Amino acid sequence: AKWIKNPVSFASKQDVDIIVELIGGSENVAKKIVFSALKKGKHVITANKALMAKYGDELAYIAEKNNVNLEYEASVAGGVPIIRSIKEGLIANKINKIYGILNGTTNYILSTMEKTGKNFHDVLNKAKKMGFAESNPLADLNGSDAAAKIRILSSISFNRTISNNKILTEGIQNIN
């Protein structure tokens, strides 16, 4: 293994065909790496839902223009191939609505609270200990994680960009 001091310049290397970005975030080095790689004709694989929610349409355009693949299946629903299913399996169908549980942490917390009668903070702490919640679960709890996922899925399903202000977001951090 070799340590790369400047990951953005790594995308310019002739002997690199595919960049896998797992840094996360939409306004940091991850953004620079992905944009640079696509513009330099490199295929990109990312699990970065924040980046795809904010810049997905622009990144898809750059990828198409440079005849490279932009793969982001892991950015929504982890191991469930929902993006590929929508893009390939349901392409002939008209999608009118999207329903689903888009955040596993929220699902675990609410389900456990209902089943056990325990309070939010106790269940959240248990979720952290079990690895179901991040050490800083703010994006899960305030709804921004689910909003990013619905923005990505809506963009694909309805073939248009959905602005953040059109997505009603309500977190669970104040629930009892």
Where does each model-flagged region fall?
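Oxidoreductase and adenylate-handling cofactor-binding alpha/beta cores
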Residues: I82-I95, T106-H121, A148-I162
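NAD(P)-dependent dehydrogenases' Rossmann-like dinucleotide-binding region
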Residues: I95-T106, L168
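Substrate-binding/catalytic subdomain of NAD(P)-dependent oxidoreductase enzymes
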Residues: D122-N176
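Hydrophobic beta-strand scaffold residues
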Residues: W3, V44, N69-L70, E134
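Generic structural signal for well-ordered, non-membrane alpha-helical segments
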Residues: W3, M52, G56, G79, ...
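A structured beta-alpha segment of the ubiquitous adenosine-cofactor-binding alpha/beta core
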Residues: A1-E27
